[in-house]
């Protein structure tokens, strides 16, 4: 078996070790059953079998690819698991493609290619891959890097039919990846790299380069024939250039992207080491990373002929092409409210920059160990994030159970529930639950969309909230004045810290292997979360708005 692998996939050892480290870091992605952000809208509609409403919602946004991806995944019978498996595989496939490009195309030394690829595979920048409603982003990423690999493997083939069929396949993969529109810009970073690698693209530009230059334009032209987004998302992703204050906005977004894409991932995990359990996780992850590195180093070594300047230069170029499409529409990445989804294209550029800096300032014999430390930090941070995402979901499950207990009171007439979240420590990144979260939880608990839940911090007006609900569900704004109820989300466990790994693993075990009733009971017994009527000394802005709207 080993001889067969060495003959057809000589890189089998490195790819196996990349898979090993990636799985250690992301196995909890496959075990996550939570709904977050837009999942609470999209997947709730799918649960209600409202495919027509789901289509109308996405048609207004011109997100046809999103619809068909979810339609296809629904055939599995478990959209949650299907999206998690797809996201898991897509990023692993992307890592494989990057490693093979570095090894087979650019002839980079084995250990260097392995370390750079591992930094990419373990990067915590796009942690939003857990969100089912944006699984298209992960699919686009895999198709893009596969397209790049196929192109470079066949571009100089002596057999014309292999060359042109391979280029055609890569063009199809690139074209599909453009449904995540940021790849329209990122693609030109690939074009620059292709020219750098093969200067004949310039001398034979009509046959070799022209199709690359025109492919994104062709996609954009076809996309524009479908019309502009309309409805509540008509102005989504509008260019900021020319808008008031656009220069300062773009500068701030650029800095946010640079900080969150390069500095934040290296600094934030260190705080976790103050907690004993995550210090242990770090030590285990470091041992695994170092062992993998030594195995690769021992499999054979050749001198890396590419200097640090090339890694830094191309790292900066690719990082810039990954950041610019988001800065242009005012969507800079930052680590709150799932906004790091705008860092989706940054991991490969960041990995090259990290390696270039290490090659510049760290002696060669220490570089592999430093990368192992960084990888261990990334693994620790990822496991911590999966832990907090699960705790976020368990909190939501407890709220659903409490709402079910009050179903009679909440469904006899249109109701607007104002939630006061007093246990944000349960939330991922201490986030409060959003309008979408409450929509999904209430619909799951009560089986109806006539009751609306909002966080007390919500900035939209009552009128806009009901318009948004109508857009999402097709249910019209209630004709009768809704009853306004104020509820505090609390835990009656006193001052005990319940957000612990021990509690997480205890509930996770029952979630995966127990019955639904056992799962609910374990959450209730462990976290003791309740909805308590909130007494107000005066009318809230929500009471006043509702009365004003229905006068």
Show which residues each predicted segment covers:
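Intrinsically disordered, polar/acidic, low-complexity terminal segments
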Residues: 5-6, 11-61, 70, 74-82, ...
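Membrane-interface transmembrane helices that cradle and orient dolichyl/undecaprenyl
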Residues: 144-166
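Perimembrane helix-loop-helix junctions
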Residues: 3-4, 186-217
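Signature aromatic-anchored transmembrane alpha helix within multi-pass, membrane-resident enzymes
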Residues: 358-382
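Membrane-interface alpha helices of multi-pass inner-membrane proteins
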Residues: 163-181
């Amino acid at each position: 078996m080993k001889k067969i692998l060495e003959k057809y996939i000589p890189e089998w050892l490195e790819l196996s070790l990349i898979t090993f480290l990636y799985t250690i870091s992301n196995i909890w992605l496959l075990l996550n059953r939570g709904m977050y952000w837009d999942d609470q809208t999209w997947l709730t509609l799918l649960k209600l079998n409202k495919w027509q409403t789901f289509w109308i919602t996405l048609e207004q946004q011109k997100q046809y690819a999103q619809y068909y991806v979810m339609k296809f995944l629904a055939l599995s019978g478990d959209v949650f698991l299907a999206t998690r498996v797809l996201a898991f595989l897509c990023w692993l496939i992307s890592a494989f493609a990057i490693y093979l490009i570095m090894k087979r195309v650019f002839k980079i030394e084995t250990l260097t290619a392995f370390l750079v690829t591992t930094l990419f595979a373990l990067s915590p920048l796009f942690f939003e891959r857990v969100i089912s409603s944006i699984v298209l982003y992960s699919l686009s990423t895999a198709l893009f890097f596969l397209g790049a690999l196929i192109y470079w493997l066949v571009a100089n083939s002596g057999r014309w039919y292999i060359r042109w069929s391979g280029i055609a396949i890569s063009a199809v993969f690139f074209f599909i990846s453009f449904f995540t529109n940021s790849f329209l810009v990122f693609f030109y970073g690939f074009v620059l790299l292709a020219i750098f690698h093969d200067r004949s693209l310039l001398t034979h530009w009509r046959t070799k380069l022209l199709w690359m230059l025109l492919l994104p334009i062709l996609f954009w032209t076809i996309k524009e024939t479908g019309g502009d987004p309309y409805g509540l998302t008509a102005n989504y992703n509008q260019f900021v250039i020319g808008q008031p204050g656009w220069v300062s906005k773009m500068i701030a977004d650029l800095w946010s992207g640079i900080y969150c894409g390069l500095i934040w991932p290296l600094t934030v995990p260190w705080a976790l080491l103050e907690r004993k359990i995550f210090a242990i996780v770090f030590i285990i992850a470091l041992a695994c990373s170092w062992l993998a590195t030594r195995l690769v180093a021992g499999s054979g070594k050749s001198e890396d002929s590419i200097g640090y300047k090339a890694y830094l230069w191309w790292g900066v170029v690719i990082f810039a092409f990954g950041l610019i499409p988001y800065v242009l529409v005012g969507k800079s990445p930052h680590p709150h409210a799932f906004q790091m989804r705008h860092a989706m294209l940054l991991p490969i550029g960041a990995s090259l920059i990290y390696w270039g800096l290490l090659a510049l300032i760290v002696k060669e014999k220490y570089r592999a160990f430093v990368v192992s430390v960084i990888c261990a930090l990334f693994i620790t941070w990822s496991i911590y994030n999966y832990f907090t995402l699960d705790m976020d979901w368990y909190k939501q499950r407890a709220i659903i159970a409490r709402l079910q207990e009050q179903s009679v009171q909440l469904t006899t007439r249109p109701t607007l529930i104002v939630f006061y979240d007093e246990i944000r420590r349960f939330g991922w990144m201490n986030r409060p639950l959003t309008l979408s979260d409450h929509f999904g939880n209430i619909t799951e608990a009560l089986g109806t969309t006539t009751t609306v839940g909002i966080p007390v911090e919500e900035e939209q007006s009552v009128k806009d909230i009901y318009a948004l609900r109508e857009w999402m569900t097709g249910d019209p704004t209630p004709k009768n004045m809704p009853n306004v109820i104020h509820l505090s989300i609390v835990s009656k466990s006193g001052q005990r810290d319940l957000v612990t790994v021990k509690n997480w693993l205890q509930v996770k075990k029952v979630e995966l292997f127990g019955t639904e009733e056992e799962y609910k009971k374990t959450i209730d017994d462990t976290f003791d979360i309740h909805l308590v009527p909130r007494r107000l000394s005066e009318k809230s802005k929500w009471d006043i708005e509702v009365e004003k709207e229905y006068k």
